[in-house]
């Protein structure tokens, strides 16, 4: 936890510039696939595991669903490098870091969906992701009109999607 706090409070780290980024903690223990010893473990940053959660949630629910909560289980791991307590969770939330937690009698899950933006409009990941999805969908949907005359009939066609 101390390393996370140091990183977030480091003056070189400026989260207000990015509503596209997110931080997750802690690192995750898993099997070392490259080791000769099949029982060898390795500690990895959560990024690959988080990408898997994003992909699974997107496929099952859509980009509007936060990749967090009880559906956002971390798969293929052996444990976390640190057990995040409720108190730790509160501190991480204040710092804009999404916790990965193991709850008693349950599995390990992502328990936060914040971006590192200080802009309240972009604080939550699903908002940014939905905006990106809409922007991309609209852009793709009107490509047919790029070289059409910019006039009232074109605007009417775009509005009715003809």
Language-model features: locations:
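Structured, hydrophobic secondary-structure cores that serve as assembly/anchoring elements
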Residues: 1-161
